[in-house]
Design a protein with these regions (language model features):
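Long, low-complexity or tandemly repetitive, helically biased scaffold regions used
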Residues: 2-97
Length: 97
């Protein structure tokens, strides 16, 4: 039973950190649009930290599921992975490339 509790907690934490990542990416994009590059970079850094935390919980969830996650767990894992692409695109926009 402990494993199921741990899996649920890992999934919830991963999704919570994804929500934080989205929040700070949104803030970074807002400031970037306003030409406030310094503030945009600060928000990017926070988003990057949140995504790093989400990735930790994604890896933990994968480990706890013994490489056989439920559909709901797999979707959470995929959300974390997709946020890596979103953050990468923001980094490109911040660098002007």
């Amino acid at each position: 039973m402990l494993n199921l509790t741990e899996r649920l907690e890992a999934k919830e934490q991963a999704l919570h950190q994804v929500d934080r990542t989205k929040k700070y990416i949104s803030g970074a994009r807002k400031f970037l649009g306003e030409g406030k590059i310094g503030l945009a970079i600060e928000r990017y850094d926070i988003a990057e930290d949140a995504l790093e935390s989400a990735n930790y919980y994604r890896e933990l969830l994968w480990k706890l599921s013994n490489d056989d996650p439920t559909q709901e767990e797999f979707e959470a894992i995929c959300v974390v992975e997709s946020m890596k692409i979103v953050l990468y695109k923001l980094a490109k926009d911040l660098s002007g490339k």
